[in-house]
């Protein structure tokens, strides 16, 4: 066999191998695709209640190459963290702070996600005499008038902002009064604040989800006032603005947001906690005009 014939045969064999190999290439699977990380910062309550982790897990199950990581902090601290540019999406519950965040160009828009409500809690013997009242402003006035021990988070969290709104509506400035205590560890969240209030047999304003998740551990306090519209607690999404915060993953955040407001995610919210606590911890609020 001469060299030219040998070379031709070799070329033909390589061509056949190339064709066969091309037919055997498998489609990329989850382990070979690039991974995307979405970073969010959330108000503490929905994280501690398990709601945010449940939503994250459901989304990551559908999108195995997406990793969602979260920080938790009070709304004020969450917003401050987002301004540093390390957060793609915030989940918060203080309308005035949210609107300012967007107005300052750090967030693109406020998007309703879910809601629950706040309640006024206090000791069983109720020295302020507010049990059964449905007017939160009138109830908190009675606490102040009788100089009864009241515990505040005092950290500009959404819970603290709501509390301040109620005091303002009542025409009362509680700071500086001996009966008004700012819990020194309030920034750690509603759970620790509620348990401290229980130890002190005092009054406080608390979100219902925290109450339900901690109810079994409470010895001295319970819900005394509920049902006032002023106590509604709207939890909203704000994507961070890529024009101001250039390192944020806006597309990834918006893909997650679009799923969070979908029927699938809203159904998860609707049923979360129902089996364990006998009632849901949060209610769906996507596409609502009230938030």
Map each language-model feature to its residues:
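Secretory targeting signatures
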Residues: 1-32
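Structural motif
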Residues: 16-19, 82, 248
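Exported/periplasmic ABC-transporter solute-binding proteins
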Residues: 24-62, 67, 76, 95, ...
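Short Pro/Gly-enriched coil loops immediately N-terminal to beta-strands
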Residues: 105-106, 110-125, 136, 228-233
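Short beta-strand-centered segments that line the small-molecule binding cleft or hinge
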Residues: 79-94, 98-113
């Amino acid at each position: 066999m001469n060299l030219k014939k040998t070379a031709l045969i070799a070329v033909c064999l390589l061509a056949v191998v190339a064709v066969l190999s091309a037919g055997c290439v498998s489609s990329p699977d989850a382990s070979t695709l690039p991974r995307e990380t979405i970073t969010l910062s959330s108000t503490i309550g929905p994280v501690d209640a398990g709601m945010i982790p449940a939503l994250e897990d459901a989304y990551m199950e559908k999108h195995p190459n997406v990793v969602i990581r979260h920080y938790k902090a009070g709304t004020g601290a969450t917003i401050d963290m987002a301004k540093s540019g390390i957060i793609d999406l915030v989940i918060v519950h203080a309308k005035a702070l949210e609107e300012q965040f967007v107005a300052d160009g750090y967030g693109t828009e406020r998007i309703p996600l879910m809601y629950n409500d706040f309640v006024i809690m206090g000791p069983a013997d109720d020295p302020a005499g507010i049990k059964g009242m449905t007017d939160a402003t009138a109830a908190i006035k009675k606490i102040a008038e009788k100089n009864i021990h009241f515990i505040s988070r005092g950290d500009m969290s959404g819970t603290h902002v709501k509390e301040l709104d109620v005091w303002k509506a009542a025409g009362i400035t509680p700071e500086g009064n001996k009966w008004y205590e700012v819990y020194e560890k309030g920034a750690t969240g509603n759970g620790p604040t509620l348990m401290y209030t229980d130890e002190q047999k005092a009054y406080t304003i608390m979100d219902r989800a925290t109450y339900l998740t901690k109810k079994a551990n409470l010895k001295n306090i319970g819900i005394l006032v509920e049902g006032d519209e002023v106590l509604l607690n709207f939890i909203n999404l704000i994507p961070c603005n890529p024009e101001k915060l250039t390192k944020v993953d806006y597309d990834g955040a918006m893909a997650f947001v679009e799923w969070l407001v979908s029927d699938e995610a809203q159904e998860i919210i609707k049923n979360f906690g129902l089996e364990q606590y006998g009632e849901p911890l949060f209610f769906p609020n996507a596409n609502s005009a009230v938030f």
